Amino acid sequence: MLLLETHNRILYDEVISHFEGDRRVNNIFADFDGVKFNVQTSDDKSSLMVSVSLHAAADLLKNGGSALLKSVYGDMLQAKPEGGYDVTLVIQSSFSGNKEELAKKVSLLKRHLVAAPFLMVFEGIEAKKPLPEIIAINYRTDETFYLKPQGDNVIVIFDIAFKDADDVILSKIFLQSFVDVRKTISNVPSITFSQKDPPLELKGVKGVRAGQANHGFVSFVLFPAHIKKPQESADLIQTFRDYLHYHIKCAKGYMHTSMRNRVESLIQVLNRAKPEPVNTVKRTITGKFFKQN
């Protein structure tokens, strides 16, 4: 199975190209979850501005995002983002340090923003700090994920909108593999899936989408062993939704390919079974023609 990268390769290449070339850049491109990037060079080419917009920006920034971005990007982080975007970084062309490390850091902008609530909760549990009872991140127009600290554990609940009933079925089959793995490996997160009805941990929480046919709730319980590896755990859990949908699409593609191959083989069998047409003209071994009735 594929593990998705947490950095944006296009953004990485744009930053590297800015330092290697003498050209103006003004590119807009997308990432998973409706994320939009805008990369543009200043008029005098003295700096490169990188902006990002995403649906969950407000929730993420108030739940650890602002503090994390400030600690990672320092003076590059602008107090007032570009119009129409949620976060803006400005990279000076005169930067003389390791440009590849800088490009990698900038390419992780979305990762740091989305990982912030997880890291905030992990740190709070480790330091025994008071934490909100539940944190809701509306990361898409019709989807939310929730973080619920519970003693030394964290429950992460994804409210996922599926395209149709077929996707719901495929997701159940796919998620069963996580359950099966837990039977042989003891330190993997506990996982449950429920359709329509939200888990009990969301009882009384406002805005929960209950009773919708093509919605499902995937719950992970992260244990102390996972919390002690905050960066790795944040990387894996924040890409889960995209990871799930990617493999649903792969499963559909595999089934469609298998069906096409099966149809082609059946057509070949039928073609071989066709009777030869009557009144055909054939050639003998000596080259003469004769008509067969």
UniProtKB/Swiss-Prot annotation:
Q: What does this protein do?
A: Functions as a component of the Arp2/3 complex which is involved in regulation of actin polymerization and together with an activating nucleation-promoting factor (NPF) mediates the formation of branched actin networks. Seems to contact the pointed end of the daughter actin filament. The Arp2/3 complex is involved in organizing the actin system in cell motility and chemotaxis, in phagocytosis and macropinocytosis, at late steps of endosome processing, and in mitosis.
Family indicated by similarity:
Belongs to the ARPC2 family.
The organism's superkingdom is given as Eukaryota
- Any GO MF annotation of the entry: actin filament binding
Q: Could you tell me the Gene Ontology terms of the biological process aspect for this record?
A: actin filament depolymerization; actin filament polymerization; actin nucleation; Arp2/3 complex-mediated actin nucleation; exocytosis; phagocytosis
Q: How does it assemble?
A: Component of the Arp2/3 complex composed of arpB/Arp2, arpC/Arp3, arcA/p41-arc, arcB/p34-arc, arcC/p21-arc, arcD/p20-arc and arcE/p16-arc. Interacts with carmil (via the region between the LRR domain and COOH-terminal proline-rich domain); carmil is required for Arp2/3-dependent actin nucleation. Arp2/3 complex, MyoB, MyoC, and the alpha and beta subunits of capping protein all form a larger complex with carmil.
- Species classification: Eukaryota, Amoebozoa, Evosea, Eumycetozoa, Dictyostelia
Q: What is its main location?
A: cytoplasm
Choose one Gene Ontology CC annotation of this protein and give it: cytosol
The name this protein goes by in its record? Actin-related protein 2/3 complex subunit 2
Enumerate the UniProt keywords alphabetically. Answer: Actin-binding, Cell projection, Cytoplasm, Cytoskeleton
